[in-house]
Every structure is written in C-alpha cells, then in structure tokens.
Amino acid sequence: MATVYDVPGDLLVERVAKALKEVPEIKPPEWAPFVKTGRHKERLPEQEDWWYYRVASVFRKVYIDGPVGIERLRTWYGGRKNRGHAPEHFYKAGGSIIRKALQQLEAAGFVQKVPGEGRIVTPKGQSFLDKIATELKKELEEQIPELKKY
C-alpha cells in the first residue's frame, strides 16, 4: 500500500481536493470568494474551488510534518511581498484560512488536536490519504512502468 510519501504532492493534493468536495463537513466559508490568502498576495485566488485545494494541502502538510500548529503553517504558506521600491519582506499567510481548514478537518474526523503540540492526523485521516495515494500510484505505474519496482 502506497503512502503520501510515495506519490508527487501536486497530484495528490489535486485528488484529495476532489475527494474532499464530497465530504459534507468541508465547505468554503461565506467570505472565501472575497479574501486574499495572505498579506503578501496582491490578488484573490483565481480558481473558484481554491478552498478545497488549500484544505487538501493543509491536510497533506499535517500528515507529513505533524504535530504542527497554525503558526508553523502560516509560515509555510507565507511569501515575499512586493513593496514597490522598498526591499521585499517575508510575510506570513492569513491564519483564519488555515484555522478554519483545520477546524473543518477536525469536524470530519481526519485531524485531532494534541494540547501543547498542534494537530496530528487521525487513523481515519491517514487511511483516507493512503487510499487516495494508492489509487494514484497505480495510475502512475500504468503511465510510467518503471515505477513498479518501487
């Protein structure tokens, strides 16, 4: 059985985002169409379903780096801000988006809080991600036969 570590992250996040659309607890907040993802961004996200991709990305990040807290995730999703003539400066991403994503993953039973440490993936969440990774790996093996040896 393949795990999250065995498949490319971008393909996995895309698949997980599609699967999360069918989970009733995961849905974009009312304000999602109107917000930037952080201080460092100039524009809103272009994709209409960007919320599911961010939740899937946060889910994968908690799986790989867990236990992880909101501040560390804010740093991960942050970036450099173009300040005109002034030198560029790093800014963290918005905390509300990450917080709401983690709360929705908790409500779905995929993530749980560990007091003083952050959040970790539950066995249900690990199973959810590993099943998607296994399906994805089988498809990749059909396209690229050399991957079967791994």
UniProtKB/Swiss-Prot annotation:
Transmembrane segments: none annotated. GO terms for molecular function: RNA binding; structural constituent of ribosome. Keywords: Ribonucleoprotein, Ribosomal protein. Pfam families: Ribosomal_S19e. It comes from Thermococcus kodakarensis (strain ATCC BAA-918 / JCM 12380 / KOD1) (Pyrococcus kodakaraensis (strain KOD1)). The keyword Ribosomal protein applies. It comes from the Archaea. Belongs to the eukaryotic ribosomal protein eS19 family. InterPro entries: Ribosomal_eS19, Ribosomal_eS19_archaeal, Ribosomal_eS19_CS, WH-like_DNA-bd_sf, WH_DNA-bd_sf. SMART domains: Ribosomal_S19e (SM01413). This is Small ribosomal subunit protein eS19. May be involved in maturation of the 30S ribosomal subunit. GO terms for biological process: ribosomal small subunit assembly; translation. One of its GO terms (cellular component) is cytosolic small ribosomal subunit.
